[in-house]
Structure formats: C-alpha cells, structure tokens
C-alpha cells in the first residue's frame, strides 16, 4: 500500500506547475504524513498518519 493516512485516507493529489508563460507541467501535492506508532487492535503498529489527524486528536501515539 502506498503512502496514505491510516485514519483519514488523505494522500497525494495532482495539479500543475505553471510557468510565467502559463505552460502546465504535472506535479504532486503531497499530504503531510508522519510515520507514527499507534495501537491497532491492541497492538502497537507503525503507520502513516496525517499531521491533521495527529493535531486534531483522532490518533494517540504509543
């Protein structure tokens, strides 16, 4: 599985870089994902979690 928030499902989205001439090049907007240890089914597990989920208290670290 790729880098995706274990709690909220946030992942990278796509968009464009725009030059002064407004030429478009594809780019990725990466979510602010942090690898943290949380309890999953009563056992500690390292998963990717978004910073937004950590700040809002949806996840507690072990």
UniProtKB/Swiss-Prot annotation:
Q: Which domain of life is it from?
A: Bacteria
Give the Pfam families listed for this entry. Answer: Ribosomal_L28 (PF00830)
Q: Which GO terms describe its molecular function?
A: structural constituent of ribosome
Can you supply one Gene Ontology CC term for this chain's record? ribosome
- Disulfide pairs? none
InterPro entries, alphabetized: Bacterial_rp_bL28, Ribosomal_bL28, Ribosomal_bL28/bL31-like_sf, Ribosomal_bL28_bact-type, Ribosomal_bL28_sf
Q: Which UniProt keywords apply?
A: Ribonucleoprotein, Ribosomal protein
Q: What Gene Ontology biological process does one annotation of this record name?
A: translation
* Coiled-coil intervals: none
Similarity-based family: Belongs to the bacterial ribosomal protein bL28 family.
Q: What is this protein called?
A: Large ribosomal subunit protein bL28
